[in-house]
């Protein structure tokens, strides 16, 4: 008999129903559950798949470069970044009539095109790319890297090149190489690129391989480095009248501490960025030499952890047993990696708009909005994944004997206190915030807006003032003109910071009031509730008072049959599933807040946000409804326009989102009956009954239907908001 899908599970392959296909797809990446898997093969498979992942990333970025070089307008955009719209790629669509062709032909193109809202033009311009040839070269280079990655992945699956289990378990060596090699050397290389290519490029000097060795990045070369006069590299920085990409107003400094933004590009000074990467490189190169490997010097991570026993025995045996627990659990390691990456991604969203690093990106409002929203949603999915794998760790990998009375065991021992405190915080935030919003709604409805409860965020304003924002009149730390920190800041360090923080045209430390106070607490409610669900799911994954033997049922189970009431919906998977809805809604509030606040800032009518954001009707009417007007006007006498595609996507997103509920609010028996009726009709219909199936059609399992529903809900939700965000922003600002 020919091998049927899935080949990794002979038990599933022999299943006579369509369950074989769905369960096969669901467990394809759960290598641990595959037939004949060993720990060594598990590590080797994951290692090889990383190369495949890299190949896909390189291919994708290569495609971006290639299409912009081929169909974009990079060279004409460079001439006037503020007024030429950057083109992502051409659109070829046989359905386009003349109105559509005209609507989508823009940015100086000869036919219909898509506009780029990803910020790649600004990024490439900042790092020194100037011609289409540069873009093609980059695309080709990344294509080669992609091919090399694929070959490396294949190679590491060959018997001779398969790394051993001990190689994967060597934490010290891996940490040294990742810290020094991955972060240290790459940061140093990037600092080098900025100094040798990007900074000269910003001063009108075109450095490529043919003149790379002839152009000195600094007039004094390596002399200041070798003689210890490093401050010479910071002298004669670009002036405030510097025109980016030209020598007009340019200086010669390469490593500075100016602070603030380049007046023309509204982005961080390139010389500050180079300095930052050099410092990061130094730190990581040092950090990558800290752990003990072949030479018997440096720290042993196990010894470090075992020594961490808090005084007074207040945390039991401290970190004893943690080294082996983490080192032997891929899920624990993945959970830690995802938690870190999730936080970093959210920080990227925050910093890309508040401290923009790329030239002219701050004036491309649609791109700013798209990048913020994109990174926040990505962060949300990554963070929920961290808790999912944390729960799988507790079910599959946690060993109580190995972790007796250490910090991990003690987390489980007092989980009731953790969960109930989170629950209390969520309830407090939810009822108080909703209470304030609803009170304000009623006051507005009754025509007495002066009776609203409006709370000034004085603590946050004080923190902003301490960092130098003077508009609140707090006169503290950096906003106190008489203080030593203020006076030192004008000359010694970051002289541009205080100018930037008090400049109203950027997004640095936005002025906040009662509307911000309320939405901040609404977001805090969402964050705490999402965390509550995720933390409870992980801490109760092994068992709870209701179901002490939960771990024996695995990560995702629907119920333990009818004989045992109350065991439905309490698997660790169900907690993850529920948390994703909360995560999406929380990030919805975050992005609504960010977008509305910025639209009013960019349009110069901040009072609209300040006055309308203190009650729910204000959000619904003046943000959602008002800004979706271009998307919901249906067919009109003017026909097609460049926002039509977003209007269609807005509708389609709602459709996908609503389809999710068909899977979420239904029961398996209903679908099973429907399928059997359809199968009966199929078998009795002439011609149709010539087509037979090998697998008996059965309804999706409860857990699978939930996953399908969740996927539709998530994708529809994001499609809908993406269309709204891009159309409402580009419709106003072009």
Curated annotation (Swiss-Prot):
Keywords: 4Fe-4S, Chlorophyll, Chloroplast, Chromophore, Electron transport, Iron, Iron-sulfur, Magnesium, Membrane, Metal-binding, Oxidoreductase, Photosynthesis, Photosystem I, Plastid, Thylakoid, Transmembrane, Transmembrane helix, Transport. The keyword Phosphoprotein does not apply. The chain crosses the membrane at residues 46-69, 135-158, 175-199, 273-291, 330-353, 369-395, 417-439, 517-535, 575-596, 643-665, 707-727. SUPFAM superfamilies: Photosystem I subunits PsaA/PsaB (SSF81558). GO terms for biological process: photosynthesis. Its EC number is 1.97.1.12. Pfam families: PsaA_PsaB. Gene3D superfamilies: Photosystem I PsaA/PsaB. Chlorophyll a B1 binds at residue 654. Phylloquinone binds at residue 671. It is an enzyme of class 1 (oxidoreductase). [4Fe-4S] cluster binds at residues 559, 568. It is a multi-pass membrane protein. One of its GO terms (cellular component) is chloroplast thylakoid membrane. It is found in: Plastid, Chloroplast thylakoid membrane. GO terms for molecular function: 4 iron, 4 sulfur cluster binding; chlorophyll binding; electron transfer activity; magnesium ion binding; oxidoreductase activity. PsaA and PsaB bind P700, the primary electron donor of photosystem I (PSI), as well as the electron acceptors A0, A1 and FX. PSI is a plastocyanin-ferredoxin oxidoreductase, converting photonic excitation into a charge separation, which transfers an electron from the donor P700 chlorophyll pair to the spectroscopically characterized acceptors A0, A1, FX, FA and FB in turn. Oxidized P700 is reduced on the lumenal side of the thylakoid membrane by plastocyanin. This is Photosystem I P700 chlorophyll a apoprotein A2.
